[in-house]
UniProtKB/Swiss-Prot annotation:
Glycosylation, residue list: N169, N417, N435, N566
Cadherin domain segment(s): 35-133, 138-242, 247-346, 351-450, 455-560, 567-670
Encoding gene per record: PCDHB5
Domain of life: Eukaryota
Protein name: Protocadherin beta-5
GO MF annotations, alphabetized: calcium ion binding
SUPFAM superfamilies reported for this sequence: Cadherin-like
Cytoplasmic face of the membrane: 711-795
SMART domains in the record: CA
Membrane-topology annotation of the record: Single-pass type I membrane protein
Main location: membrane
Top-level taxonomy: Eukaryota, Metazoa, Chordata, Craniata, Vertebrata
Modified residues (N6-acetyllysine): K296
């Protein structure tokens, strides 16, 4: 074991110190008090706080308490007054035995911060025990030929008191033959001897009975008695004599039972029965003596296990008696040799668990160690595991503190299992292990952490109020209230974003709710920040970005920009009967307020006066002729166009077109709405068209006047077709005829009717001057077009 320990020098070992090691604030001298033994419990020994210079309030705030080996509660500290009280009645003989002085060592422990004070309590002896002889009767056999002055040893009386309270004198009942002499032994005890004063005469008195009294020195004195019975024998000339009057021997405490301790020897010069010697223990106390002697061989053997820690030394008196009753005495001093038969003991005084994680050099535990063995067998070392953030520090004698070596981290390790190993230096080495569990208490050193730095949430527009749109989540590595997270909305960076009216957050679980119905067309996306705050002190927080994207719903129907469907006079498109198939009649223009596929528009010719005459392109809204026109086709046609989006479910709108088939363009006027009072500001579309068409207004007016003049001159050659229901003559002053401008191809003429009170413009395709499509019979069409242009005198 020694080799194994020597191979681990890296272990933090704290060597046991024989002298007092002082804590940083502890004094070097102990405070000593003295009280008589058997003092009643509750007795106030002293005001300890005053004697140590401590405030009374300091005792309570610093967790003061008394400590005695084995954590026995013998003294009690009143932390309110500072008085040191006797917890129970103390018996000096039980606490210390024959040891003098009897001093009990206490420690005053202050836990916050850790500080020790040594306190000694001396128990003074009182005369509470009377002397007591080991036997009620002692037998002496004395030959009648014994000369006066002969001394006969007597057994001593036991008195558990010490000092003057123990046996001080022996007396004997009055008689004419003997007196008692009192002598001091080497250990301080007094022993009696019976001295013959007058020769005995067996024929006169064969037996005597005397009373031996032992007196102690107490006040008042106590006494004990025994009877000495003396038998007078015939002549026996010689008493037994030991070869040595004093024997010294050492016996290991772990010696087996019945092992031989020593052999004594005595001789008697007489012959026969008077020379036969028998041996016995003089005191003969079977209770206290762990030895036995063979009466014939004088072998002293061990009859009960020895314990160095209980009794390290014995004085055994041996008496040798011959057949005639004469005796001799010797003393055997037996020293019990200590062996390492006791493992160290560890007594935990205080354990602070849990321990804050942010407090280095915090005292976690205070404990004491002891080993009743002596020498190296009682020297100890303490150690803990090498991989722990803790240190052992010696304080007072046999006391250690376990402190944190550095700042702990509860999130990394919430508890530590520490094994304190106490090993003595004996052979073989014995050790004791004590396991403690240290819990690490949480400190708010971790801010909440979101599972994502940013969140993207999707909400379909037209949602119901209080709709749960998503959640954010944050975790805190701390524990308890330090890990309880509260969520909140942070003020938006955009001052125009009314966040409080858009969303709310559940403070406990991070659920986000839309407070009102969202409109994609008004707000496509917005972002804000959420905060997560724990409930520690001080509180820590973090934040995350939340983006909310509003998904479009098909909540807007297509809106037809052209032709306008505002209840005013319908627009009429003029189509020459000579138009080829695929001739562009007009183009329906529509928009949809939605986005994506909800705004993908398709066009469909829903109704027609003559099905098959016109066709409509589904994707661009162009209305074209589907075949050649004939004289049999009606002049007026009404087309209903369906404009449908691609949403789910789809939404639609309809537009009505009027088409007029013409052979020429004599008076191609259409009924116009009544003029209205001028309006201060036109519609944005009207303004755009007016600005675009005003640049060519003069050319258009000139063309119209020229057209009217030609028609009047050649009425006979061209019949009037498609007459508009407006008075002939110049246009009213609030109407402007525009040609070759607009959002469609420049090859078209437009008639724009602007009303001063409507705030909107109406425009209509009349007919193309030069067709923008050349069908298969391109040459023939060009020829007809040239003739047509000649009819207007445009070449």
């Amino acid at each position: 074991m020694e080799t194994a320990l020597a191979k681990t020098p890296q272990k933090r070992q704290v060597m046991f110190l024989a002298i007092l090691l002082l804590l940083w604030e502890a004094g070097s001298e102990a405070v000593r008090y003295s009280i008589p033994e058997e003092t009643e419990s509750g007795y106030s020994v002293a005001n300890l706080a005053k004697d140590l210079g401590l405030g009374v309030g300091e005792l309570a705030t610093r967790g003061a308490r008394m400590h005695y080996k084995g954590n026995k509660e013998l003294l009690q500290l009143d932390i309110k007054t500072g008085n040191l009280l006797l917890y129970e009645k103390l018996d000096r003989e039980v606490m210390c035995g024959a040891t003098e002085p009897c001093i009990l060592h206490f420690q005053l422990l202050l836990e916050n911060p850790v500080q020790f004070f040594q306190t000694d309590l001396q128990l003074t002896d009182i005369n509470d025990h009377a002397p007591e002889f080991p036997e009620k009767e002692m037998l002496l056999k004395i030959p009648e030929s014994t000369q006066p002055g002969t001394v006969f040893p007597l057994k001593i009386a036991q008195d558990f008191d010490i000092g003057s309270n123990t046996v001080q004198n022996y007396t004997i009942s009055p008689n004419s033959h003997f007196h008692v002499a009192t002598h001091n032994r080497g250990d301080g005890r007094k022993y009696p001897e019976l001295v013959l004063d007058k020769a005995l005469d067996r024929e006169e008195r064969p037996e005597l009975s005397l009373t031996l009294t032992a007196l102690d020195g107490g006040a008042p004195p106590r006494s004990g008695t025994t009877t000495i019975r003396i038998v007078v024998l015939d002549n026996n000339d010689n008493a037994p004599e030991f070869l040595q009057s004093f024997y010294e021997v050492q016996v290991p405490e772990n010696s087996p039972l019945n092992s031989l301790v020593v052999v004594v020897s005595a001789r008697d010069l007489d012959a026969g029965a008077y020379g036969s010697v028998a041996y016995a223990l003089f005191q003969g106390d079977e209770v206290t003596q762990p030895f036995v002697i063979d009466e014939k061989t004088a072998e002293i053997r061990l009859k009960r296990a020895l314990d160095f820690e209980a009794t390290p030394y014995y004085n055994v008196e041996i008496v040798a008696t011959d057949g005639g009753g004469l005796s001799g005495k010797c003393t055997v001093a037996i020293e019990v040799v200590d062996v390492n038969d006791n493992a160290p003991e560890l007594t935990m005084s205080t354990l602070s668990s849990p321990t804050p994680e942010n407090a280095p050099e915090t005292v976690v535990a205070v404990f004491s160690v002891s080993d009743p063995d002596s020498g190296d067998n009682g020297r100890m070392i303490c150690s803990i595991q090498n991989d722990l953030p803790f240190l052992l520090k010696p304080t007072l004698k046999n006391f250690y503190t376990l402190v944190t070596q550095r700042t702990l981290d509860r999130e990394s390790q919430a508890e530590y299992n520490i094994t304190i190993t106490v090993t003595d230096m004996g052979t073989p080495r014995l050790k004791t292990e004590h396991n403690i569990t240290v819990l690490v208490s949480d400190v708010n050193d971790n801010a909440p952490a979101f599972t994502q730095t940013s969140y993207t949430l999707f909400v379909r527009e037209n949602n119901s109020p209080a709709l749960h749109i998503g959640s954010v989540s944050a975790t805190d590595r701390d524990s308890g209230t330090n890990a309880q997270v509260t969520y909140s909305l942070l003020p938006p960076q955009n001052p125009h974003l009314r966040l409080a009216s858009l969303v709310s957050i559940n403070a406990d679980n991070g659920h986000l709710f839309a407070l009102r119905s969202l409109d994609y067309e008004a707000l496509q996306a917005f972002e804000f920040r959420v905060g997560a705050t724990d409930r520690g002190s001080p509180a820590l927080s973090s934040e995350a970005l939340v983006r909310v994207l509003v998904l479009d719903a098909n909540d807007n129907s297509p809106f037809v920009l052209y032709p306008l469907q505002n209840g005013s006079a319908p627009c009429t498109e003029l189509v020459p009967r000579a138009a080829e198939p695929g001739y562009l009649v007009t183009k329906v223009v529509a928009v949809d307020g939605d986005s994506g596929q909800n705004a993908w528009l398709s066009y469909q010719l829903l109704k027609a006066t003559e099905p098959g005459l016109f066709s409509m392109w589904a994707h661009n809204g162009e209305v074209r002729t589907a075949r050649l026109l004939s004289e049999r086709d009606a002049a007026k046609h009404r087309l209903v166009v369906l404009v449908k989006d691609n949403g789910e479910p789809p939404r639609s709108a309809t537009a009505t077109l009027h088409v007029l088939l013409v052979d020429g363009f004599s008076q191609p006027y259409l009924p116009l709405p009544e003029a209205a009072p001028a309006q201060a500001q036109a519609d944005s579309l009207t303004v755009y068209l007016v600005v675009a068409l005003a640049s060519v207004s003069s050319l258009f007016l000139f063309s119209v006047l020229l057209f009217v003049a030609v028609r009047l001159c050649r009425r006979s050659r061209a019949a009037p077709v498609g007459r508009c229901s407006v008075p002939e003559g110049p246009f009213p002053g609030h109407l402007v005829d525009v040609s070759g401008t607009g959002t469609l191809s420049q090859s078209y003429h437009y008639e724009v009717c602007l009303t001063g009170d409507s705030g909107a413009g109406e425009f209509k395709f009349l007919k193309p001057i030069i067709p923008n499509l050349l069908p298969q019979g391109a040459g023939e069409e060009i020829g007809k077009t040239a003739a047509f242009r000649n009819s207007f005198g445009l070449n």
